[in-house]
């Protein structure tokens, strides 16, 4: 139920004389599929029914000022975010929209970060952790459909990771945004679990054009099986440094089966891959994705490709859009209902090889961009609204 009528005034955090206690990232929703007629005011009018908003903005092309078909709302607390998500489906200006919990800049660089899935991977669980420990912990987030604690086929020994499937993708989004969880007195790392097909989809979204194999730089091909030693998250592998997610090349084994384990768990490859960082050489020739900070869908400099997308919104950068910069700051000159925002990079394409800036509250890469030879690519991926 909405917490108030359309005309109710939810005071900002400033009205109460203190800032919200919970991190902004946990209080923020991405809203996709907006009508091009939707304004900051009409977006706010709808979503403030479930709580007070500390920010609300419809993202617009910096030149034409036309809506890019998505926006963000930030509540004052996570409880209000939960209430809003529980009230789905949402219709704004006569159009059903697609709310999701916003993804952090750090997580945005990870393969499949923006895909909608109902299964999580739980890594780092100990030998004494049983299925009921996982059920007791995760059922507090939402309805569980299945739990799989992975074991060695021959010895029956637990392999140190598990999969949990829920009935709602929002439960997964809520869990993974927290990153670390304590289960049976042990710290565990939780990520979205993607099928091979989903990884290929994520790869295709990020890897349109440019050099390097499918969003892992050289030798990676997350999902391909390219590379000599260390397939699938195992020995020497690491999220695509060499080998692939479930790919066949080399000594690693497949997704959760055989070889040296999933993502370094249960094997000797080190947590999340050993190797030089997440994805080896990087997307576009330098360490890290996008050369010097091009976010998800941003443009990797140094010969890399732009590409990318967030679950398929607005193919091709949407109206020639700028380098929106994932989750943090729409910055530039754009203002929200609450006045000018902190500096960021929503100002057309970036230049000089830096595929996007990292400052501000919505920094990252929901846009096109790409300087220094990087390709422009897709903001929010495949379908227009």
UniProtKB/Swiss-Prot annotation:
One of its GO terms (biological process) is mRNA splicing, via spliceosome. Residues 207-218, 350-385 have a biased composition (Gly residues). Residues 27-110, 118-206 form the RRM domain. The keyword Ribonucleoprotein applies. Transmembrane segments: none annotated. PROSITE patterns: RRM. It holds the Pfam family RRM_1. It is found in: Nucleus. Its main location: nucleus. One of its GO terms (molecular function) is mRNA 3'-UTR binding. GO terms for cellular component: catalytic step 2 spliceosome. The keyword RNA-binding applies. It comes from the Eukaryota. Keywords: Nucleus, Repeat, Ribonucleoprotein, RNA-binding. Residues 1-24, 199-218, 331-385 are annotated as: Disordered. This is Heterogeneous nuclear ribonucleoprotein A3 homolog 2.
